[in-house]
Amino acid sequence: QDPDINWRHVDVMLIHEDEIEKEIFISHSCHHCEEPACMDVCPVGAYIKLENGIVQPLHDKCIGCGYCIVACPYGSITKGKDGKAQKCNLCAEKLERGEEPACVAGCPCDVLKLVDSDVSDSAGMEKEMPGFKRFFTKPNIRFYPRMKRNEFIH
């Protein structure tokens, strides 16, 4: 993977709360969708879905057509210097060693977590958040309920 590519992006979203328009920030990368559009449109099968849910690009198979880039509703795929599609693979090699993905380990605010979908449902995490668009791909992303100012989770 190309080290010059940023796999995470922070977007500003506008929400209306208590009749006031507010800005919130969401950090996202590949959502490792249940029904990944990138995988569906790839003419050479350069994506596979692993048992753990990771949508894994197969760099050697990629022909650089860019169909997956256009198909991803979250803009999570880009072309590398070699012209082939690249995306977050959730640091699959780190997970195999029992380590956290780089984004989770390096998050300065400790807000990114890697959790099993069964745990996320029982932990009160939500699939929806104001401003976040859930598309037909069924993204595997969950949100902690938004905290009001001066509320903290310990």
Place the predicted regions along the sequence by residue.
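Non-ligating segments of multi-cofactor redox enzymes
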Residues: 1-154
